[in-house]
């Protein structure tokens, strides 16, 4: 069994998965979505749930730096509700403050990736960081693995 880590944006969802033991997170893919058209990519998530034996979801919670919750937190929670309704699997949330900044820094400073290429992988990397932080903190869903 694995956990899927999701970095939910308004146009894409970055996806990462844990290894079966819950020690490491690896990038999987980016799923295109369109919040305005209410297209959430759940068909692709369903394929991943089935093929990867998913036990639960960890969604990034993009809180503000002062710990308040803005509209993106509401959107992430709504996506979590959609997942729970569709799949009946447990959902947990991980504070994702600065994960995108950390991902950018990793891509630019450590990997010297061009801006054009960054756009293609930034959401996957952010999802990986969200899930790895969750696994490192032994979140409640880790017991499901």
Curated annotation (Swiss-Prot):
Subcellular location(s) per record: Cytoplasm
Any one GO molecular-function label of the UniProt entry: nuclease activity
UniProt record, GO biological process: rRNA 5'-end processing
EC number: 3.1.-.-
Protein keywords: Cytoplasm, Hydrolase, Nuclease, Ribosome biogenesis
Source species, domain of life: Bacteria
Purpose of the protein: Could be a nuclease involved in processing of the 5'-end of pre-16S rRNA.
Protein name from the UniProt record: Putative pre-16S rRNA nuclease
């Amino acid at each position: 069994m694995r956990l899927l880590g999701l970095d939910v944006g308004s146009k894409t969802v970055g996806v990462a998965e844990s290894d079966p033991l819950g020690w490491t997170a690896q990038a999987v893919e980016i799923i295109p979505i369109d919040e305005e058209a209410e297209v959430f990519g759940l068909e692709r998530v369903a394929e991943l749930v089935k093929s990867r034996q998913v036990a639960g979801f960890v969604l990034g919670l993009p809180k503000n730096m002062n710990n308040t919750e803005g509209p993106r937190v509401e959107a992430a929670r709504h996506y979590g509700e959609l997942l729970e309704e569709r799949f009946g699997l447990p959902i947990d949330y991980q504070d994702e403050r600065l994960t995108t900044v950390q991902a950018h820094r990793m891509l630019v400073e450590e990997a010297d990736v061009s801006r054009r290429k960054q756009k293609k992988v930034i959401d996957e990397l952010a999802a990986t960081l969200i899930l790895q932080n969750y696994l490192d903190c032994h979140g409640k869903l880790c017991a499901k693995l």
